UniProtKB/Swiss-Prot annotation:
Main location: membrane
SMART domains in the cross-refs: CLECT, EGF, EGF_CA
Keyword Transmembrane helix: yes
Gene: THBD
Domain of life: Eukaryota
GO molecular function: calcium ion binding; signaling receptor activity; transmembrane signaling receptor activity
Modified residues annotated as (3R)-3-hydroxyasparagine in this record: 342
Region (Disordered): 484-506
Residue spans crossing the bilayer: 516-539
Protein name: Thrombomodulin
Source organism (scientific name): Homo sapiens
Entry annotated with the keyword Endoplasmic reticulum: no
PTMs per UniProt: N-glycosylated.
Amino acid sequence: MLGVLVLGALALAGLGFPAPAEPQPGGSQCVEHDCFALYPGPATFLNASQICDGLRGHLMTVRSSVAADVISLLLNGDGGVGRRRLWIGLQLPPGCGDPKRLGPLRGFQWVTGDNNTSYSRWARLDLNGAPLCGPLCVAVSAAEATVPSEPIWEEQQCEVKADGFLCEFHFPATCRPLAVEPGAAAAAVSITYGTPFAARGADFQALPVGSSAAVAPLGLQLMCTAPPGAVQGHWAREAPGAWDCSVENGGCEHACNAIPGAPRCQCPAGAALQADGRSCTASATQSCNDLCEHFCVPNPDQPGSYSCMCETGYRLAADQHRCEDVDDCILEPSPCPQRCVNTQGGFECHCYPNYDLVDGECVEPVDPCFRANCEYQCQPLNQTSYLCVCAEGFAPIPHEPHRCQMFCNQTACPADCDPNTQASCECPEGYILDDGFICTDIDECENGGFCSGVCHNLPGTFECICGPDSALARHIGTDCDSGKVDGGDSGSGEPPPSPTPGSTLTPPAVGLVHSGLLIGISIASLCLVVALLALLCHLRKKQGAARAKMEYKCAAPSKEVVLQHVRTERTPQRL
């Protein structure tokens, strides 16, 4: 078939007919060093593959979601072709196989000879176990896609003519679109680009090496070129010297002097123009870094030449020397989960209201009381901390703030009683329960013996102010006995530590009798008295029983005499 086409073209050329026109793409997109183009028109898989090969490319491979997005862009701007089917570079060799055992491509291969992919979008998800037999080819279409932005893949007979095809081209380097200085003159400038794969237009994100640019009305014809091994190309022309300074800085490596009708490139001090009239040669005494805004990398293969580089978050400006900020927030996908704020050389991520930024992700705030172990109730303070609160009449325990204890700051408070029986009641420390289920403050000062100084009764406790004659003069605590305050270690030979005047901390009461202890002592004493009385009663009963037994034994002989059998004599009857 290919031989017939070649012979036909030669025959037409020999007869003087013009050669077939080069196919014009209906749309194209370039991503870094790869370009993709849509060519409308009926063609079999073989015809489409030959045309792409003739343009130094191949039918498109769709190995990732990025390539699928490119197809969506091309289909949206193709004027209706997207509603039909387009060949891509995926085919099934002759033979049959089980698609379930052949990976995501079901045994199909790319025209590049491999089956590497991280993406697939088959129209028929389940083949019901039916084997696939080649040869088959794949076309994409958005007509029956459930998601318009994700065209589906359909198996087709390779001899069937599709409505068009997609080609893919790879280039070692690309150029950015021409930079035009803003102003009144810029509005009149019109640029038309042409690519090696016959795409023409004014809206390109990147142009591969070999692309041309026609600048009207200046009459400029520029070409995207790059030295061997370079990945970033630049715009140039065969004629030496600068062109209009408003377009790409006149092509000058350093500065462009906009002399009317005769623009000229200038180099920094110590450097000279090269033969092309646009490049500069650095002097041996000049530092390379003086020529670039951020970093300068000398080219060891070409003495005097260099390349400028920028820090992360910046890119080279059109003059290839200055650095301009990259707006990271316009990238797709966005670097932030919700809101992105661009900064000089970077960006900041922010979250919507009621969300928190945690490890680069926006998450709903977690209730700080979720894992709290509060005995009664938890009160959030902020997004990370909380406070345990207690019921009325209770307060947190200082050393265990998640637990509660009874609290009373008056001379009398209601007791905490069992609501079922009312037989079990508790009072705070320093209070005693009366008959009316009321906790009454124990007046330690009235009882005496607790303070040798001036005693002030307080709710639940007391305060002892030591007199001037005391070893702890002016000390405020619960005792003025230095031995008790010092813990009883009066014979250690060490002087007692000086108390802090005016201390508000109440030390542990040494010798203070707790109300519960008083009740316990009373109950124990009563039990002891009852036990003694019981013991006396038992001894008296035992002594009485022994005496009765002895009396019984002593009286036994007389009782036996009395109880012996009495013999009676028979008395004769008188007549």
